[in-house]
Every structure is written in C-alpha cells, then in structure tokens.
C-alpha cells in the first residue's frame, strides 16, 4: 500500500478522533496527490513517519482521505467488510423489533460513503465514495455472508457521486425489488418508493423525532410541511391527532401520502395539499 504523508502538525485532528483528511494537510512534496487514483487505500503517516491509520483517498476532493482504520496496512477487504456489517447489524437488532432500519451509516460504522437501509427482506444501498464503489463486489459478498438471500437495490443516483468521479445508476443487484417496499416504523405501516423516491426512499434518521411527535400529537391539529410521503403526518394521525394536513410540491409524493393514510385506517384524518410551502 502506498503512503500518504501529512504536513507537520496536521496529524492533530486525527489523533483527537477525527476521521477526515483535508487536501491542504497533505505534504504533496513527499506524496503528490495527483499520483493517487480515486478510491485507492493508503497508509496515513505523520510528518515523522509514524503511522496514523489506513484511509481511502480521492485526490480531487477537499476531503481527500477518509479513515477506515486507526492501524496501518488494514485496508477494507472482504473479511473487514463482513465484520463491520455484522457489528452494525447487531447494534440495530438490539434497538429495533422490526427489520426496518438504517443498517449502515457511513463513517459512524467504519464504512465511509456507504448507506444501507433495510426494509425487512429488501436492502437499498447507496454509495458516494470511489473506494467503496471499487469494493462493490466484495461488499455484496460480505452482505450475503452476514444476512444471505436478501433483495438488494443499488440506488446510486446521489449528487455526491459526481464529485467522486462516479456514474449514476439504479439497478437491482440481487433478487427482486418492487417499486414500493413495505416497512414498519414506530408501529405504523408505510410504503417506501425505493426506486424513484428521495435518497433511499425513506428517512430512517428521523425515526426518533417522529416518535417524539407521536407523543405530542394526541388531540392536536398537525401541519406536516414538506411532507414527502407522509412519514410525520400519518404517524401523528395514528397516534391520535385530530386532523393532519400534509403539504408537498410533489403530486406523486402526495398520492403516496393518501395510500399511507388508507393503509393505517386514518384517511378521514389526513388530507394532502399540493403547493409551495414558501
């Protein structure tokens, strides 16, 4: 593995726990950035040659390096991918009864630029890092080692991919994935538009916020602005809100709001309105 050498004192943030390396922290006289292909894994050294870890590099980015290990010579491979997927899975399974959650959330799970959202038997995978893209065959193999025979959609259409020099595409990698995938969140049933919706089709990162709204909603009138497919409003209605209005600029999203309300028996409480919230 090649070495990425930092300038004097540029190792401080990494030693304090930070995971990113900025291009202006690299000693380009000793390790010229243009010599590294995007997505290559490198050993990170301080100005005195002491190892700081292993990183994925992209020389064209301001954040040119993302740590994947605090040890040198520990690149992501099949074994390490499977281990990190397993650790991430165990942490989610302890928290959620249903198999509906964000399985992998990038740097926080030691897999920078990777998001995997699980909808029971369906996985939606988003990659925004050139190094993870190069590892895609191994990633799919690792997923099958940890939880075999799931249906997998690669929804790689995010804007960050262009910054990494990656093409956009959406395709099935394994099994069959319908346009709308069922999920359960906070005891409420939904359909996620995983092919054409925003991000992975669902915003699992707001799960706890929506649970909080549920506790406040009983007997209230609720306005859900930028409602998307009704994740907030429908949960409020199920929790006992008197009336809910969902506002969004997308007629397609609002059609799904109506479906979500019907799915949970709260169509009489939830109304959708197309419009510009601003």
What are the residue ranges of the model-derived segments?
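A short, charged
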Residues: 79, 83, 87-91, 95-97, ...
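Carbohydrate-binding surface patches
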Residues: 122-127
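Non-catalytic substrate-recognition/targeting regions of SAM-dependent transferases
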Residues: 104-117, 133-203, 211
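Rossmann-like S-adenosyl-L-methionine
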Residues: 175-278
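Non-catalytic accessory regions of SAM-dependent methyltransferases
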Residues: 1-120, 178
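Residue-level signal for beta-strand positions within conserved beta-sheet cores that form or flank
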Residues: 99, 112, 148, 266-268
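Catalytic cores of large soluble enzymes that bind and process phosphate-bearing ligands
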Residues: 73, 77, 131, 135, ...
